């Protein structure tokens, strides 16, 4: 339990919007994002390289690309606000950047939900060093 707490504290320091993104993932998939997505495949978690291993990993690749388009924003530190209306995620309030970061996270969380059927436990904690193929471009 202590290790989990330390890991959570470190991750919060890495990405300010991580708590919101994690909550979105949990709400959309029912999975614990810390265990299920933090180091899934070649693109989920910090950084990415090689070829996405499956549809879930491709969600992370697209999410990385989405963040990459926000070059004038700080997607790793900006905190945003969202709520649900009739079950749908609504990105609300805040700056233009915060809303765009929220939209990137929303798209990824929905993508994870839509690809739950192809999620493979073998790609959890998949070492990025195993992702040696030529990397995709956004």
From Swiss-Prot:
The keyword Oxidoreductase does not apply. GO terms for molecular function: calcium ion binding; calcium-dependent phospholipase A2 activity; phospholipid binding; toxin activity. Expressed by the venom gland. It is found in: Secreted. Disulfide bonds join 42-131, 44-60, 59-111, 65-138, 66-104, 73-97, 91-102. CDD domains: PLA2c (cd00125). Keywords: Blood coagulation cascade inhibiting toxin, Disulfide bond, Hemostasis impairing toxin, Hydrolase, Lipid degradation, Lipid metabolism, Metal-binding, Platelet aggregation inhibiting toxin, Secreted, Signal, Toxin. Binds 1 Ca(2+) ion. Its EC number is 3.1.1.4. PROSITE patterns: PA2_ASP, PA2_HIS. Ca(2+) binds at residues 43, 45, 47, 64. Its cofactor is Ca(2+). GO terms for cellular component: extracellular region. Monomer. Snake venom phospholipase A2 (PLA2) that impairs hemostasis. It weakly inhibits ADP-induced platelet aggregation when tested on platelet rich plasma from human and rabbit blood (15-25% of inhibition at 5-10 ug of enzyme), and dose-dependently inhibits blood coagulation, possibly by inhibiting thrombin activation. Also induces local edema a few hours after injection in the hind foot. Exhibits high hydrolytic activities toward L-dipalmitoyl phosphatidylcholine. PLA2 catalyzes the calcium-dependent hydrolysis of the 2-acyl groups in 3-sn-phosphoglycerides. Belongs to the phospholipase A2 family. Group II subfamily. D49 sub-subfamily. This is Basic phospholipase A2 Tpu-G6D49. It comes from Craspedocephalus puniceus. The lineage of its organism: Eukaryota, Metazoa, Chordata, Craniata, Vertebrata.
């Amino acid at each position: 339990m202590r290790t989990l707490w330390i890991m959570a504290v470190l991750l919060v320091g890495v990405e300010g919007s991580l708590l919101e993104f994690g909550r979105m993932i949990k709400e959309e998939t029912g999975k614990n994002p810390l265990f299920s997505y933090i180091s899934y495949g070649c693109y989920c978690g910090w950084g990415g390289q090689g070829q996405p291993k499956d549809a879930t990993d491709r969600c992370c690749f697209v999410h990385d690309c989405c963040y990459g388009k926000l070059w004038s924003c700080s997607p790793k530190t900006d905190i945003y606000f969202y709520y649900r209306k009739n079950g749908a995620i609504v990105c609300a309030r805040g700056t233009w950047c915060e809303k765009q970061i929220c939209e990137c996270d929303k798209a990824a969380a929905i993508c994870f939900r839509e690809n739950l059927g192809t999620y493979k436990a073998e790609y959890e904690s998949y070492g990025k060093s195993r992702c040696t193929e030529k990397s995709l471009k956004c």
